[in-house]
Amino acid sequence: SFNTAEHLLALQQPNSIKKIIVEVPKSAKFNRNFVKIMVSNSKNIPPSLKKKFKANIVVVYEFGACEYSANVKQTGDYKDHIAMDVGGKPLRSLKIKLKNGNVLNAIKFKLLLPETRNNLNEVLGSVVMRELGFISPETFQVKVDVNGTESIMLFQEDARKELLERNLRREGPM
């Protein structure tokens, strides 16, 4: 809903993102999957319940919004990646793969429940590592709305080619 050429610098800054909205059209199946994870006997999230769902992602900036098609799925090994908010609505850590476009040059990223990464300690750790010259994924706190359930989550880009490019490195053999 805006001319990207006018906002190129702002599109590269995490603080220009006001909110990320995740809409899963098949929300009944998405919620049923959440319940199956909750009631499973294991402390771990069974891999069979980490199903992909088609979703629409809207990234709201100070100056407009961008819409993307995506696949989302449950991420995390342990059940600390799922929770209920005060009103009893489901919260979960998500892995998102955009089918078109990117957010801060990331095509794949995670929206994590803050408790799974010791809240802001993960953000502090990534900033310190970056300042020391290490390659570190873009990590920051952001408002998120998943099917109408609002929460604060951690955005963390996946360790992929875009991470290397952002750190002025090239892909190659190690």
Predicted segments, located by residue:
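Phosphate/dinucleotide-binding and metal-coordinating scaffold of catalytic cores
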Residues: 1-174
